[in-house]
A protein has these predicted regions:
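Peripheral membrane interaction modules
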Residues: 2-15, 120-166, 193
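Serine/threonine-rich intrinsically disordered cytosolic regulatory regions enriched
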Residues: 13, 154, 158, 965-968, ...
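C2-type phospholipid-binding modules
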Residues: 103-122
């Protein structure tokens, strides 16, 4: 028996494997010159190498191109795969979003049988709903917990074919659909034209089973004579209520080439077609929150109040600025939240002192309360607040450090975080010891080694108590922010963090990982809406080649080991920096004299071919006698003698000691006791000298003098104006090519190398801040990778537009009327009368003179425009929401600005003037926001109890004072909203429904 069994086993293993055909089919409209490839893990599909994949062939079916390819495989074939759009040279242009597809063949097929795989292109919106923000926070995995499912759940969908007999006269169809927005008592069904699908009878619909995650599948054997089959997916709840998916019927047809041999058809139908989900959120820096318990600035635990506000108003997200420690200079300069001392450590400014211990001595409690009262000021006093918190924390530390360090929670935290925590604590100790964060001045400790670190942080060392204080602070900060995370998740509110593009050059990260940073350069942005001189943030640029050696481990750790602990969504600050970064030499102060890295420069050869040869004239500041006279008037000879050398008659060059921006600043900075007039004159001279220093057309590459970069805005220089016409035309052409054409593929490739490593390192929803000078390659890449873009109405991305129209925004965006880098909605309204009138007329469609201030009526309309936009998220600064009520809009509007990007030393100290507890108790204010959110479809009555509140746009008593001015003669457009409640206000007595147009001063009876 044993021998026979062995022989039988060998015979079975040696039998010839059956050959099967797989026909991949995908509808996708490409552009001219583009093709589709299928690539995958198997060698037949190129082993993920695009050029070695299988090319699909197109054919026209109505208005759609349908792509097909057939491959012959063995019966044991299995693979992961995806589709890629390629150009005519088979270079990848666009990849599908989301996870890799998986294919395993069913058992029991006859030799030569065909398996048809009907796929749909995986777009970003479909895949985003598998992110933690939706899956765990917003929907709470409810889509995977349906209780109204008929049949058994199939945990391995590839094995379910074995239970279905294969009939030569029929085709076994596997229907596959994803649905992430599903209520617990709903299930997914398929219904269609064939008898097997119930012939459109809801009662005979076929139930799908939840397999894994949000995937739902079923098997149906359909007679070949029934094809083509029309069908739809539907949802049924326990009460029998049916919800049909949107759009036209789906159609399933057998391929002509395999009509007779097809045995199995896999209909991978993407996602359930429903109205796109949209949400609303509120944005606030932690430091700006005011509460009855916070000391001097907002604290992590204050975020619970923001979560409560979100819940009460129907908002589903709270967005923050970076929360990392920025204590580089130990003064108010550190209020800048984007200049990280450590990309892992949290900022002690956000510590809740009262939560350090439940056994605080009375004297410490009294001191905390005294500090709270003293620091309860209009704005944040950064230095005093941080000093108070560190002082109290140190006293509690001295009392309870042994208790904390011996706790299981601390030991677990330390073990999980010591890789960054120990270097951070050592850095803080050395910063305090040497009085500077500039580690180049630390002597022996200036160069980081593990041996030096181990000595510094040794529990046996003389400095351990000072080092361990940082452990203590970070543990409590972590505990408090983690408490907020858990609270927000329980309330189904997304916490959204912010990932800064740079780090301070005097930081833990540049000390510990110096090879990752280019310390002789500085990061910024070219001139744009924010600053006509460009921005220079002072951060070192990245050595991406070095980072790539460990697959961008430093970036991945930032996300997986820090941000993902607390947030389920994040914003990439200046996502354009992952395509290319604007880089200045370290002696620059402004951002004007920068270049893109990476970029393809202009070569000496290509310029000489076009008749450009005087590179010295073009690449050095163009300073001539008449230019000096125009700048300095009668003082020009004095200035020329002090700052310049005359290298030819009436031609000047900067002296060595004044030939950079930093040198000019040093030369024009007066002593503190100088008169205000002298200081003003020196600053005016500095500006004029900067202008002369910027009289450059081409900038030489510092590593290769034969390469040049066009100076941004070179055509606005006197140097350019005094060139001959031929040179102007050539240089202008090269300028346009450099900035707008020749870099596109390079920048696309660069982003596709770096961004996926970040995105794949966590399950957070990712949004990219893509404002400013945006290359053409950016939007396709963001869409391909599943990143949401940002749309600020006053900063439209389309050329020639003054204002963006929220109704035209793409779904994969976050929209807002303002952001932390701009003035608020109210302040912007007051800045420019002409612009205000154009906006009022062109964007609000109103002909009356606009109010001088952005009153609640105007604010209401602007917010409503954004809420009704197609954008996935509408996220509003809290200041813009407070503009909805006169009582909260009395503060001067310019005091609500968080940042002034034109000022590199801006003091980030804005603080909301109303405690959050007061806002939460204001039912009228909360109701206005809630009504706006609900009426826009970004929340429903199921999201909260609306039994005592209307769910229509807020037309409240204080908004009716001007109604009688425009009560007649207004056109009712497609945006009209029926309001089913009665109002009686000044000039209006309505006893039947009214129709409100988008501006609520315009109300007419219906």
């Amino acid at each position: 028996m044993g021998s026979g069994g062995d022989l039988g086993g060998r015979t079975n293993s040696l039998r010839r494997l059956k050959r099967l055909n797989i026909l991949f089919k995908l509808p996708y409209n490409t552009q001219w010159g583009q093709n589709l490839m299928i690539i995958g893990s198997d060698a037949l599909l190129g082993a993920w190498v695009v050029e070695k994949g299988q090319r699909l062939m197109p054919r026209q079916e109505g208005d759609v191109l349908v792509w097909e390819v057939s491959i012959s495989v063995s019966e044991r074939f299995e693979t992961e795969y995806n589709y890629v759009v390629v150009d005519d040279r088979f270079r990848g242009l666009r990849r599908e979003s989301g996870a890799r597809r998986v294919l395993s063949l069913p058992e029991g097929l006859s030799n030569g049988a065909t398996v048809e795989v009907h796929d749909l292109w995986q777009d970003s919106p479909e895949t985003l709903f598998t992110k933690e923000a939706y899956r765990k926070v917003l929907f709470g995995d409810e889509a995977c917990k349906s209780t109204h499912i008929e049949g058994e759940l199939s945990k391995d969908p590839t094995q379910c074919f074995t239970n279905v007999p294969l009939n030569p006269s029929a085709v076994v169809v596997q229907f596959k659909i994803a649905n992430s927005v599903l209520h617990p008592d709903q299930a997914v069904f398929v219904i269609g034209s064939s008898s097997e699908l119930g012939q459109w009878n809801n009662e005979a619909a076929i139930a799908l089973s939840n397999t894994v995650g949000y995937s739902w599948e079923c098997l149906v054997s359909i007679s070949r004579t029934e094809f083509p089959v029309s069908y739809k997916y539907i949802l049924k709840n326990s009460s029998g209520v049916v919800t049909y998916e949107n759009d036209e019927n789906r159609v399933l047809s057998l391929s002509l080439s395999a009509k007779k041999s097809s045995s199995v058809l896999i209909a991978a139908d993407g996602s359930f077609r429903s109205k796109p989900w949209r949400g609303a959120g509120v944005a606030i820096p932690v430091f700006a929150i005011r509460s009855t318990e916070s000391v001097g600035a907002g604290e992590f635990l204050d975020l619970k109040l923001m979560v409560d506000m979100a819940v009460k108003t129907g908002m589903r997200l709270v967005q923050l600025l970076p929360v990392n420690d920025t204590s580089v200079n130990m003064m108010w300069w550190d209020s800048y939240p984007y200049s990280s001392l450590s990309v892992f450590a949290l900022h002690p400014l956000y510590l809740r002192l009262q939560a350090l211990s439940n056994k605080l001595p009375n004297d410490i409690k009294e001191d905390i309360e005294n500090y709270r009262k003293q620091l309860d000021m209009k704005e944040v006093d950064y230095e005093a607040t941080l000093a108070a918190k560190l002082s109290i924390a140190k006293r509690v530390y001295n009392l309870e450090k042994d208790l904390v360090f011996n706790s299981a929670l601390f030991k677990k935290y330390f073990d999980e975080n010591k890789g960054w925590l120990q270097p951070y604590a050592a850095f803080c100790f050395l910063r305090n010891l040497f009085g500077t964060s500039d580690h180049s001045q630390w002597g022996l400790y200036g160069d980081f080694t593990q041996e030096k670190l181990d000595k510094l942080v040794s529990p046996m060392g003389d400095y351990y108590d000072a080092v361990a204080f940082s452990y203590y602070l970070q543990f409590h900060l972590h505990s408090q922010l983690a408490e907020v995370r858990d609270y927000a998740m329980k309330k189904h509110v997304v916490l959204k963090g912010d990932l800064p593009i740079g780090v301070d050059r005097n930081s833990v990260d540049t000390w510990q990982f110096p090879s990752l940073f280019r310390m002789t350069a500085s990061t910024g942005a070219p001139p744009d809406y924010f600053d006509m001189n460009g921005q220079n943030w002072g951060f070192p640029t990245y050595v991406w080649e070095e980072m790539a050696k460990d697959n961008y481990g430093w970036w991945r750790a930032r996300l997986s080991q820090q941000m993902a602990k607390y947030f389920s969504a994040y914003r990439i600050d200046h996502v354009l920096g992952f395509f290319r970064i604007w880089e200045m030499p370290d002696h620059a102060v402004t951002g004007l004299m920068g270049r893109f890295r990476p970029s393809i420069p202009l070569s000496t050869e290509e310029l000489e071919r076009e008749g450009i040869w005087d590179f010295q004239r073009l690449s050095t500041p163009y300073v001539r006698c008449h230019i000096l006279q125009g700048k300095f008037g009668d003082r020009w000879t004095e200035v020329a003698e002090n700052y310049f050398d005359e290298f030819e008659h009436l031609c000047y060059q900067f002296k060595e000691e004044y030939n950079t921006e930093k040198k000019i600043i040093s030369a024009t900075t007066l002593k503190d006791n100088a008169s205000s007039f002298a200081i003003q004159e020196a600053e005016a001279d500095r500006t004029r000298l900067f202008d002369l220093l910027h009289e450059v057309i081409l900038m030489r590459d510092r590593d290769d003098p034969s390469k040049f970069y066009p100076r941004f805005g070179m055509d606005k220089t006197v140097s350019f104006d005094e060139l001959d016409d031929h040179s102007k035309n050539v240089l202008k052409s090269k300028y346009n090519d450099y900035f707008f054409h020749r870099q596109e593929q390079l920048w696309r490739d660069n982003a596709l190398m770096t961004l996926p490593a970040l995105l794949n390192s966590s399950d957070m929803l990712c949004c990219g801040e893509d404002l400013g000078m945006v290359p053409a390659c950016v939007q396709p890449v963001l869409s391909e990778l599943g990143l949401l873009g940002l749309r600020i109405q006053r900063m439209p991305s389309a050329p020639g537009q003054e204002f963006g129209n929220p109704a035209d925004y793409e779904y994969m965006t976050v929209c807002a009327p303002s952001c932390h880098d701009s003035s608020t909605m109210r302040a912007w309204w007051e800045e420019d009368e002409g612009r205000r009138e154009r906006f009022f007329r062109n964007m609000l469609g109103l002909t009356d003179p606009p109010p001088e201030t952005c009153d609640p009526h105007v604010s209401h309309l602007i917010l409503q425009q954004h809420l009704e936009s197609p954008s996935m998220w509408a996220i509003f600064p809290l200041q813009d929401l407070m503009a909805l009520k006169d009582e909260y809009a009395k503060r001067p509007a310019n005091e609500e600005t968080i940042n002034d990007p034109t000022n590199p030393r801006h003091y980030w100290r804005f603080r909301v003037h109303i405690p959050m507890e007061t806002l939460l108790c204001d039912d009228d204010f909360v109701g206005i926001i809630r009504d706006l959110v609900v009426s826009s479809g970004r929340a429903t009555s199921k999201d909260f109890d609306l039994s005592s509140s209307s769910i229509v746009p807020a037309v409240r008593d204080h908004e009716l004072k001007h109604v009688n001015k425009t009560v007649s003669g207004k056109r009712l457009d497609d945006n009209k909203i029926i309001i089913d409640r009665t109002y009686s206000g000044e000039g209006l007595d309505v006893a039947k429904p009214v129709v409100a147009t988008s501006y609520f001063n315009t109300i007419v009876t219906a």
